[in-house]
Swiss-Prot record:
Any further remark recorded for this protein: Negative results: does not have the ability to interact with the G-protein coupled somatostatin type 3 receptor (SSTR3).
Transmembrane segments: none
UniProt remark on domains: The cysteine framework is V (CC-CC).
Primary subcellular site in the record, as a coarse category: secreted
Cell compartments where the protein resides: Secreted
Name of the protein this chain belongs to: Conotoxin tx5b
Entry's family note: Belongs to the conotoxin T superfamily.
Length: 14
């Protein structure tokens, strides 16, 4: 699944 998801928003690095 892509990064920046509702579950992995922190993996985006924002």
């Amino acid at each position: 699944k892509p990064c920046c998801s509702i579950h992995d928003s922190s993996c985006c690095g924002i």
